[in-house]
Amino acid sequence: MKSRFSTIDLRAVLAELNASLLGMRVNNVYDVDNKTYLIRLQKPDFKATLLLESGIRIHTTEFEWPKNMMPSSFAMKCRKHLKSRRLVSAKQLGVDRIVDFQFGSDEAAYHLIIELYDRGNIVLTDYEYVILNILRFRTDEADDVKFAVRERYPLDHARAAEPLLTLERLTEIVASAPKGELLKRVLNPLLPYGPALIEHCLLENGFSGNVKVDEKLETKDIEKVLVSLQKAEDYMKTTSNFSGKGYIIQKREIKPSLEADKPVEDILTYEEFHPFLFSQHSQCPYIEFESFDKAVDEFYSKIEGQKIDLKALQQEKQALKKLDNVRKDHENRLEALQQAQEIDKLKGELIEMNLQIVDRAIQVVRSALANQIDWTEIGLIVKEAQAQGDPVASAIKELKLQTNHVTMLLRNPYLLSEEEDDDVDGDVNVEKNETEPPKGKKKKQKNKQLQKPQKNKPLLVDVDLSLSAYANAKKYYDHKRYAAKKTQKTVEAAEKAFKSAEKKTKQTLKEVQTVTSIQKARKVYWFEKFLWFISSENYLIIGGRDQQQNEIIVKRYLTPGDIYVHADLHGATSCVIKNPTGEPIPPRTLTEAGTMALCYSAAWDARVITSAWWVYHHQVSKTAPTGEYLTTGSFMIRGKKNFLPPSYLMMGFSFLFKVDESCVWRHQGERKVRVQDEDMETLASCTSELISEEMEQLDGGDTSSDEDKEEHETPVEVELMTQVDQEDITLQSGRDELNEELIQEESSEDEGEYEEVRKDQDSVGEMKDEGEETLNYPDTTIDLSHLQPQRSIQKLASKEESSNSSDSKSQSRRHLSAKERREMKKKKLPSDSGDLEALEGKDKEKESTVHIETHQNTSKNVAAVQPMKRGQKSKMKKMKEKYKDQDEEDRELIMKLLGSAGSNKEEKGKKGKKGKTKDEPVKKQPQKPRGGQRVSDNIKKETPFLEVITHELQDFAVDDPHDDKEEQDLDQQGNEENLFDSLTGQPHPEDVLLFAIPICAPYTTMTNYKYKVKLTPGVQKKGKAAKTALNSFMHSKEATAREKDLFRSVKDTDLSRNIPGKVKVSAPNLLNVKRK
C-alpha cells in the first residue's frame, strides 16, 4: 500500500494548489497530531483547508479532521506569524521532495518549508530563511548543516535538476548493478521519477514490469531503456502545469465464507494513488476523480476505515484457516489408521505364507542366545550363512536383540521370481524408513504418504523371538482389529470436534463482523472528551481532566442556567451541570456533581471525606479584582458559595446502551426528577441494597483484588449534623492579635463585595500574612463537625458586627488614618465583647484560605497591616512630584487607556456602598484546604485578603472563536434531551442496541442499572479494574449475546479513561466470576 508522496505526485499537487489557493489569507492553524497540521485559508465567498503531514503528504481536504483540544507550541508559533497573511507562492525546491510556502511579501514574508522525504520535517522561517521554529531538530553531518532555531535554512543543499542520463552513463549503471536485481529498483535511486512512472515507461517500450538486470540486456535494450527514461522526463514536464485527473488504484480481496454455495464476495481496498493511469494499473479496478488533489484527500480520509475492514478480513481468514487445519489433521489421522490396518494385515499374511522360514529363523536365533553366544558373533554367523546362500539367513535383514526381535524380509512365495525382483531395493528402503523414527515434520508427512502397502512386494516384518510364527501372525491381526476400532472411534470424535470447531469459527466470524460494524457505527459524542456522566435526574455533568479542559469547559460550555460545581481541594475538577431548560436543578443532581468533583481530586488518594460547593454561572469569572492575571484553569468566584453535604468517595462503573429510535419510548422517564416521597423510597431501597452488598461481602461473595485485602486503610469518621443551632464549635488559633485587628477593621468599615481567589487543579500555593507560619499539608486528623453549625456562627458574628457598625452606616463615617490604625494595633482594643466569637469565625475562615476584602480604602487597610518598607517613602515622594499636576479625571482617563482595573475598583467600591445589605453574614468554608495559595507580591501589597474566583465568559478566549468544532458541539448540545433518552442503563430484551458507552459516575446514579460495580479508593490499577468489571458483566447470567458483543467492541483505552486513580472493585459474587 502506498503511504507517501513521490516526486511526480508532489509536482502534480503543487500545480493544483497554485491554481486554487494563491492569494488566500490564513485564518487559523490547527494540529491534528504532532506531525499533521491544518491551515485554514479564506477569501471572500471561499474557504479551504490545507493539510500538511510531515514526511508524507500535502493536499487540501474537505473532510473534518479531529483537532487537538489545546494547540501545540508549533501550531501557536505558526498562528503568531502566519495568521492573516496571504499565501503568495508554493514551489518545489530543486527536484527534492521539499515544498516552500511563502506567506506575505518582502520583509514581512514568512516561509513554511515542508520536507516529504525520510522522517520529514516542517520549518517556519522569516523572509531571510532564518529558522523561527522547527518541528524536528536535527544535524546533517554529511553536509555539516545544523537545523535549529536562529540557523539559516540551507536552500542551496536541495538537489538541482539534472540533464537526462547519457547512453554511456546508463550502460555503466546497468553493468555495475547486481545480477538478478529488478531494473526499476536499480534506476529509482538515481532518478527523480519514482518506481511507478519508471515501470510504466518500461512497459510502454516493450519491457516487462519486472525486467531484471542480467546478461540478456544487450546494447539495443539499453537504448530502449533510455527512450523510456525520455518519456518519464516528458511526464515530469507535464506536471509543472498539471490540470488532469486523479486515480485511486484498488485491490480486490476475496472474503472467505464457510458456506460453499454462497457467492464469493469481493472487498475493494485502496492500494495506490497517481496523477496518471499507468499501464501496470490499467487492468486493476480504479476510481477516477476530477483532480489529483481530491483523489489524495479521498485516499487518506478513507484509509483508516479500510484498515478496520482489512483487519476484520484477516481475522476471518485466520479463523477459517484454523478450521481448515482441523479438517486436514483429522483426515491425516484417519488415513494413517487405515494404512496401519492394511500393513498389519499384509504382515500377518506374509508370516503365514512363510511359516517354515520364520519358525526356523526363530529357532536358530533362540539356540544361539541359549548357548550364550555374543550378539556380535551371532551377527557374524548370520552374515556367513547369508554368503553361503542359506535361505533362512538370507531372510534375516537385521537383528534387534535388545528388543528380542528379528527383522525379516518376507515375500509372497507364490509369485514368479521376475515379479519379485522388481524394485526390491526401493521397497527395502521404504520399509527401513517405516521402521526408523522420522526426523522433522516434513519427513513425517512424506513418510505417511509413502507408507501405502504394496501387495506382491517384499516387506520387512519384525518377528518376536518369544513367540511362534503363528503367534506373530496373530499379533499383527490383533493390531489390525485394534486399529479398526480406533478408526471408528476417531471418525466419531472427529465429527464432533469438527462440528465444535466449525461452530466456534462461525461465532468468531460473527463477532468480528459485529465488532467491525459497531466500531463503524459508533458515534463519539462531544462530551466524551471530558469527564462526564448523566445524573439520576437526566442532567449532563461534565468535568475537566486537566487545567486546559477546565478552561475550555468554562469558556465554551458554561452557559446561562448552568451550575458550576467545585471543591476546595488540590486537583479537584471544575464540574458544570448543563441545564438547557433553565429550571432549578434538584438537590440530588447537585449532590452527585459534588461527589464527582471530590472523587476526581486529591481526596480520592488521601481518602478524605469533605464537602463540595456550587455557584451560578454568572458568579464565575476570569477577571481578578485588581486586574491581575489568573493562570489557566483558575477562575474568580464572586458572591456566596453554596456548600453541599459531605460526600462518600464512592463511584460506580457501568455501561450505557444506545438504543434505536424505535425503542426510545420504552426508556423515557427512566431518569425523571422525583418528588420527595419517591426520593425517600429510592433512598431506602439504595440503603437496603448497600447493606445487602456489605453482607455479601462479609459472607465472601463480594471481593476485590488480593492487594486490597492486605491494604491497611485509615478509618475516616464522618458525623452528619442534623440540628445546627444546638452545636457548639470551639476553634483554637495561634494568631489572636492579627484576627482581633481584622475584626476591628471589619466592624468599622462597610461590607464590600465578596471576592475570592482560587487556584484550580495543579496550582499549589500559600496565602499568608507576615508573621504567619505556613499551613502543614495534609492534616492527619479531620474534624468535620463544623460543616453544618457554621451557619449559627455566621449569624452571631454578622449580628454583632451589624450592631457595632449600624451608626456608621446610617451616616458618613470618618476613615481611620494609618497612624491611628497602628496605635489601635499596639493597644489591641477589642471592638466589642462579641468580637471573640467573630474572631473564631475569622480564624477558621483564614485557615480555609477564604478571605474577605473590603474595596473601600484598601490602601489604608494595607497600611494598617503592613508598615511601609525601606525605600517606599522616597518612592512615594518621587511619584507625588511626578503626578502633582494630575487630577482624578486625568488619572481615570489614563487608567482606562492602559486597560488597568484601577478605576473599576473605585466604581465597585461605590456600588458596594449602595448595594450591600446590613445583615449580610460572613461566609466561611467548612473544610481546611489541601494547601494554601501562593499569590504574587503585588497582590499581597495591594489586597491583603483576596477571595476566590470567577468568570465572565467574554473576558477571555482560549481558541479561535469561530472554530467549527465549537459550533458542532453547540449544535449537538441542542439535541441532548433526545440523546439522553436513547442512552439507557436498563436495556429491554426487545430493544435494538446499537453500541455501548462505558460510564464512570457516582454510585447513587446507578441504582437501576443492569450492570454495575462499585469503585472505592484502593490499590488496583484502573486498567485492571476495568477489565475485572467487564469480565463480571460478560459472565452475568442476564447478559444477552448482543450485549456481550457490544462489550467486546469497546476499546481497552475507552474502558478505563474516566476511572479515578487506583481503586477497589466491589460487586456481588465477584469472587465466583474471577474463579471461572
Swiss-Prot record:
Residues carrying Phosphothreonine:
T7
Q: Which domain of life is it from?
A: Eukaryota
Q: Has the keyword Cell inner membrane been applied to this entry?
A: no
List Phosphoserine occurrences by residue: S417, S747, S748, S763, S831
GO CC annotations, alphabetized:
cytosol; cytosolic ribosome; nucleus; RQC complex
Return one Gene Ontology term, BP aspect. Answer: protein-containing complex assembly
Describe its partners and assembly state. Component of the ribosome quality control complex (RQC), composed of the E3 ubiquitin ligase LTN1, TCF25 and NEMF associated with the 60S ribosomal subunit. The complex probably also contains VCP/p97 and its ubiquitin-binding cofactors. Interacts (via its N-terminus) with XPO1.
Known disease link? Intellectual developmental disorder with speech delay and axonal peripheral neuropathy: An autosomal recessive disorder characterized by mild global developmental delay, mild to moderate intellectual disability, motor impairment, unsteady or ataxic gait, and severe speech delay apparent in the first years of life. Signs of a peripheral axonal neuropathy, including progressive distal muscle weakness and atrophy of the lower limbs, foot and hand deformities, and dysarthria, are observed in most patients. Some patients may have autistic features or attention deficit-hyperactivity disorder.
Q: What is this protein called?
A: Ribosome quality control complex subunit NEMF
* UniProt organism field: Homo sapiens
